[in-house]
């Protein structure tokens, strides 16, 4: 799912799939993820952004996880590792985030910025690390999205308030 990127994301994705969908950007990351989930067709959904990378060791660990994952697991959390060159969250270098989802569960993304899912399912915390290689400082964008949501009266989850405090 592309939200209007200008960094060749769609062209790169086309090397791996013909299932590329456009989503009009409405300042809401959770809406974009919910749209992406609606397009999924496999048993599990791996949720990733264009600036996230799996190195060889973690790619191998993810492939191995597929063979040992118990059927009652609904979500696998992976360590989100921020590259510190543009990172404003210096005190949160590595944290667990939900990244792999069982498709048959009705997960809903919440919060327009620092989006997450309601975690009522059975969750497995893996050792897999997703490297976040952001290309710039996203603080202005994040705060702008937060204030637009606030002005609309959208409830901001405690998790998001914590993320914003780290910025």
Task: Give residue ranges: language-model regions.
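A short, glycine-/small-residue-rich helix N-cap motif at loop->alpha-helix starts
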Residues: 20, 24-31, 37
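A conserved acidic beta->alpha catalytic loop
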Residues: 2-11, 25, 49
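Active-site nucleotide-sugar/metal-binding loop of Leloir-type enzymes
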Residues: 15, 34-44
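Catalytic-site signature of metal-activated, phosphate-bearing donor transferases
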Residues: 31-37, 48, 54-167
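Hydrophobic targeting segments
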Residues: 1-2, 146
